[in-house]
């Protein structure tokens, strides 16, 4: 084989790219080049390795692309944060470590589209199990020997977690013991991608640690991919910058784009694959007119409903610098304590109205009052619910702004563009207030800090959402899978109209899933890896799962305030 020639070139060492790199190199006769624009996942850096430090990577640019949106027209024209991971592990290196697979009906909804019939939940479940090692043990829903370590909530954690779950049940919503099991709907403990010794379980740790010593895998960090190289309509390699030096690499079989929902469409467009009118604006030579590239962009928007805590049991003391050395030392030496948890140990999914087919609102409970990125901490004991809608009908786009591979694209999520968005956020605030006023929280609940109890009308709540709602960091769907005119890839990630070119990451989701996106992204990469290998897919299972089928979203005899 010629120098700098490989069977497969993978662009992006994130949640999907690391899965493919690991699985493809299980075959010793297959050579893989894995390119990552960021650096290594330094294991000595507490900012990415300590679960409780999850806000730190979002505050800088070493591990975060720190994109910003265009002014969002329905959000007071705010330019909103769009953090994405940079480094081995991608966004699994900087995310909140919540392991949520989505609802079974998400995948059944994908499979309802012509050509995607093999993406039902029961087709996907074997791949969720394949990827996972859950500390509570394997069962029909969970795996026991996969690369991703998943930890469950343990006795002795902050009492606010149990109180918030109990309050949700007292408000009439279901209790579920496993948000990734038979029934997602309801309130319960949240699984997290954290190792047994309290470290972040990124895909770099889970997948690359298994694969990086293989002689058939070459990993190059600080490699910014400029464009995919083509011979006609066939992808034959990539051009990239390594520490600023131009390098070409050849792919004998395929180029696999795994750069995420922002950078994957950007790379395709820069390479000449996308909407011809957009490319013409920047004099990008057209390889293939594919108008769906960068369209259909989706995300989860969320808000923080915050309360004062009457008892001194919140994480507020952990925010004080004088307490942090002891927390860090316990974590470093023992892998225990506050530092060993992402502190998202409870949450839930609800239907706000009986005619919703599956949950449309997600909750993360946090025993402190602070923004996700560590900003705007309330200077007192407090707690909060992160509340967000799950399947907004609003759609955005990613658009190339320059042929410079270091330039950021134009990003517009078009948040809150549909009347349904406003209804769901108003419902979310009002239902959350009901939950927070339940007896289970009486001993802890102080005054409402945000939005503030004085805000009650639709107009007041809408103003709060415009001013304060933030991204949940779940961009997706911008290179969607399917066979309609706006689809970008087929049911195995192959780019329509092209040869030897795939996209494999969250951008190929036809519709965003109900919950966090790391677990679904790993699953779809595992599933497509088998197809790249030419293997038969894992057999569809017949494991039961909950479908509401008209069941009321909450018990009417519950306490309401």
From Swiss-Prot:
Annotated active site: 474 (proton acceptor)
GO CC annotations on file: membrane
Reaction(s) the record says it catalyses: choline + A = betaine aldehyde + AH2; betaine aldehyde + NAD(+) + H2O = glycine betaine + NADH + 2 H(+)
Molecular function per GO: betaine-aldehyde dehydrogenase (NAD+) activity; choline dehydrogenase activity; flavin adenine dinucleotide binding
Top enzyme category: oxidoreductase
Protein's pathway: Amine and polyamine biosynthesis; betaine biosynthesis via choline pathway; betaine aldehyde from choline (cytochrome c reductase route): step 1/1
E.C. no: 1.1.99.1, 1.2.1.8
Cofactor: FAD
Keyword annotations from UniProtKB, A to Z: FAD, Flavoprotein, NAD, Oxidoreductase
Positions contributing to FAD binding: 7-36
SUPFAM superfamilies assigned to the protein according to its UniProt record, in alphabetical order: FAD-linked reductases, C-terminal domain, FAD/NAD(P)-binding domain
Disulphide bridges, residue numbers: none
InterPro entries listed in its UniProt record: BetA, FAD/NAD-bd_sf, GMC_OxRdtase, GMC_OxRdtase_N, GMC_OxRtase_C
UniProt xrefs under Gene3D superfamilies: FAD/NAD(P)-binding domain, Glucose Oxidase, domain 3
GO terms (BP aspect): glycine betaine biosynthetic process from choline
Superkingdom per UniProt: Bacteria
NCBIfam families the record matches: betA, PRK02106.1
Protein role: Involved in the biosynthesis of the osmoprotectant glycine betaine. Catalyzes the oxidation of choline to betaine aldehyde and betaine aldehyde to glycine betaine at the same rate.
Record family assignment: Belongs to the GMC oxidoreductase family.
Annotated PANTHER family: CHOLINE DEHYDROGENASE, MITOCHONDRIAL, GLUCOSE-METHANOL-CHOLINE GMC OXIDOREDUCTASE
Protein's UniProt name: Oxygen-dependent choline dehydrogenase
Species this protein is from: Paraburkholderia phytofirmans (strain DSM 17436 / LMG 22146 / PsJN) (Burkholderia phytofirmans)
């Amino acid at each position: 084989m010629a120098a700098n020639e490989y069977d497969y070139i993978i662009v992006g060492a994130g949640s999907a790219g690391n899965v493919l790199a690991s699985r493809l190199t299980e075959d010793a006769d297959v050579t893989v080049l894995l390119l990552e624009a960021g650096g290594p996942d330094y294991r000595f850096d507490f900012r990415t390795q300590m679960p409780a430090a999850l806000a730190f990577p979002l505050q800088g640019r070493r591990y975060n692309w720190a994109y910003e949106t265009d002014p969002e027209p329905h959000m007071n024209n705010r330019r909103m944060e769009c953090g994405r991971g940079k480094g081995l592990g991608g966004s699994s290196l900087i995310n909140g470590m919540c392991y949520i697979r989505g609802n079974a009906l998400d995948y059944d909804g994908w499979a309802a589209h012509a050509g995607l019939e093999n993406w039902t939940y029961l087709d996907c479940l074997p791949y969720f199990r394949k990827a996972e090692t859950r500390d509570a043990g394997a069962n029909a829903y969970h795996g026991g020997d996969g690369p991703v370590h998943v930890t469950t909530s343990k006795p002795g954690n902050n009492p606010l977690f149990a109180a918030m779950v109990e309050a949700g049940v007292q408000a009439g919503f279901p209790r579920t013991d496993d948000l990734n099991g038979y029934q997602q709907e309801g309130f319960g403990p949240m699984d997290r991608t954290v190792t047994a010794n309290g470290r972040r379980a990124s895909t770099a740790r889970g997948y690359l640690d298994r694969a990086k010593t293989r002689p058939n895998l070459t990993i190059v960090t600080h490699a910014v991919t400029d464009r995919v190289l083509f011979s006609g309509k066939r992808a034959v390699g990539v051009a990239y910058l390594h520490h600023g030096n131009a390098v070409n690499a050849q792919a004998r079989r395929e180029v696999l784009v795994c750069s995420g929902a922002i950078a994957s469409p950007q790379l395709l467009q820069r390479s000449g694959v996308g909407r011809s009118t957009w490319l013409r604006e920047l004099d990008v030579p057209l390889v293939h007119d594919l108008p769906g590239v960068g369209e259909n962009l989706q995300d989860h928007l969320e808000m923080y409903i915050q309360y004062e805590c009457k008892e001194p049991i919140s994480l507020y003391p952990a925010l004080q610098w004088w307490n942090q050395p002891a927390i860090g030392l316990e974590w470093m030496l023992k892998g225990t304590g506050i530092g060993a948890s992402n502190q998202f140990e409870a949450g839930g999914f609800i239907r706000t109205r009986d005619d919703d087919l599956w949950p449309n609102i997600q909750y993360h409970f946090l025993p402190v009052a602070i923004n996700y990125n560590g900003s705007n901490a309330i200077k007192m004991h407090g707690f909060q619910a992160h509340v967000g809608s799950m399947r907004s009908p609003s759609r955005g786009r990613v658009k190339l702004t320059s042929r410079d591979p270091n330039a950021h694209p134009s990003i517009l999520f078009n948040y809150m563009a549909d009347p349904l968005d406003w209804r769901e956020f108003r419902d979310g605030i009002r239902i959350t207030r009901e939950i927070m006023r339940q007896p289970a929280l009486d001993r802890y609940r102080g005054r409402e800090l945000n939005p503030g109890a004085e805000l009650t009308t639709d107009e007041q709540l809408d103003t709060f959402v415009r001013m304060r709602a933030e991204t949940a960091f779940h961009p997706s769907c911008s290179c969607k899978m399917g066979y309609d005119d706006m689809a970008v890839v087929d049911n195995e990630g192959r780019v329509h109209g092209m040869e030897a070119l795939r996209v494999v990451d969250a951008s190929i989701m036809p519709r965003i899933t109900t919950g966090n996106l790391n677990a679904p992204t790993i699953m779809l990469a595992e599933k497509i890896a088998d197809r790249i290998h030419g293997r038969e897919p894992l057999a569809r299972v017949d494991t039961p799962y909950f479908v509401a089928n008209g069941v009321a979203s909450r018990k009417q005899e519950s306490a309401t305030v």
